[in-house]
Amino acid sequence: EDPRPLDYLSSDSNSQSGGVDLQLEVYLLTEQMQQQELEPKLLTRGSFTNLYWTFAQMLTHHSSNGCNLRTGDMLGSGTVSGQTRDSRGCMLELTWDGDLQNALPGSQRTPIQLPTGEERKFLADGDTVIFRGFCESSDHRRIGFGICMGQVLPAAENG
């Protein structure tokens, strides 16, 4: 890890087994794909092993700095991105050409090609995004988290 987390956030135990190997997949289904009865397109496949911070570190950092975390509070990971193009964690990263570390505003972007001939750099009204998550390893059973999906609706008109 560079830079190394502060001492109170570092331990051999956390380095070896602190992270959860949660696999995430994100799919896109446009209205046109749905009308043509096509399968959703896999956009990205990522892993929580690529996160800089483990959830134990995030929880410790928040609570040790005065954040009043309580039972039932939601704690999010942020974007889950990997080093390869097919493991980038958001549409902005997926469509960027070249080196993500040095991308500048206005950098060249290549749209995602869909089986209908449609292209996307951003989500459009009517698009459905589908998230799937699961944990698995060779010595444990696969644990699935089901799916989470939502459709982008047009903005409400003032009136």
Residue ranges with predicted function:
Residues E1-G159:
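Catalytic-pocket segment enriched in acidic/His residues
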